[in-house]
Amino acid sequence: MSPSFKSTAILGAVALAARVRAHGYVSGIVVDGAYHGGYIVDKYPYMPNPPDVVGWSTTATDLGFVAPDAFGDPDIICHRDGAPGAIHAKVNAGATIELQWNTWPESHHGPVIDYLANCNGDCSSVDKTSLKFFKISEAGLNDGSNAPGQWASDDLIANNNSWTVTIPKSIAPGNYVLRHEIIALHSAGNQNGAQNYPQCFNLEITSNGSDNPEGVLGTELYKADDPGILFNIYQPMDSYPIPGPALYTGGSSPSPNPPTSTQSPVPQPTQSPPSGSNPGNGNGDDDNDNGNETPSPSLPVEIPDDLTSRELLLVAQEIIARLLELQNQLVVSN
């Protein structure tokens, strides 16, 4: 390993540690041109009276993930301690929904998957453990010829951190939970290394359809040893087995949207947490990490001294992922 490679890797690792909390969340959704707010997890938990939104609340203020060893836990359903949103977004079957992430780190390559579950009543009071999800959209590996590959998550980033999903025309009308998820695979070559980021939203769907797909309980969607969960992206890949149940016949595997230069307004936090709280501002990195450029942080770089043990683990995983990518770049260049 050359000295320049070593120094680049070390500086990149330090920069990652300094920005360990940079993962994103869905700040809102757009339906027929109307914006509906999501749960702003780095703001609303610290407000005495947060607004009613369609997005489910969560206690994942560190913007962390659900690991494979928690796939049987209710946290996998709609993220950590997920609780239903208070209101519903109205949408016609056959229409598209744009989900707007506030950010997503380029190093966190992986699939984007969408599910629906019929609440059989008001979603604002539904028991999440009773929800049965059917997959309506999935997208995974686009090109695996050069590790770590081009993924659906890269399409999301290229489209201004947004993703579009179509509500199947054939499903019956009713209130549904939309479960949108990115699975980050940068550490998935190791047991318990995949990172699931589920986000949930309440929908009121109007439809002339009649299908009521059976679905799968959220705690049964994945297993820790599924081929698409335990998966090494740091090697040439011919294909990728997208995890979860089979795609609903009325669903789709979307083609990526072309990148756009504009997007609907995304609400930004305007209030800092109370003194003494430690919400963090993400767990990932925001470097250009597409295999063409390497990190070039300015010095000195301070590593936060208030990281939790979970965040320290994330730092280690991020460092390993970055080193593997840099090593792959060196091999390719030689």
Swiss-Prot record:
The keyword Glycoprotein applies. GO terms for molecular function: metal ion binding; monooxygenase activity. Glycans are attached at residues 160, 208. GO terms for cellular component: extracellular region. Keywords: Carbohydrate metabolism, Cellulose degradation, Copper, Disulfide bond, Glycoprotein, Metal-binding, Monooxygenase, Oxidoreductase, Polysaccharide degradation, Secreted, Signal. O2 binds at residues 186, 195. PANTHER family: ENDO-BETA-1,4-GLUCANASE D, PUTATIVE (AFU_ORTHOLOGUE AFUA_1G12560)-RELATED. Lytic polysaccharide monooxygenase (LPMO) that depolymerizes crystalline and amorphous polysaccharides via the oxidation of scissile alpha- or beta-(1-4)-glycosidic bonds, yielding C1 or C4 oxidation products. Catalysis by LPMOs requires the reduction of the active-site copper from Cu(II) to Cu(I) by a reducing agent and H(2)O(2) or O(2) as a cosubstrate. Active on hemicelluloses, including xylan, glucomannan, and xyloglucan. Shows clear activity on cellooligosaccharides, generating C4 oxidation products. This is AA9 family lytic polysaccharide monooxygenase A.
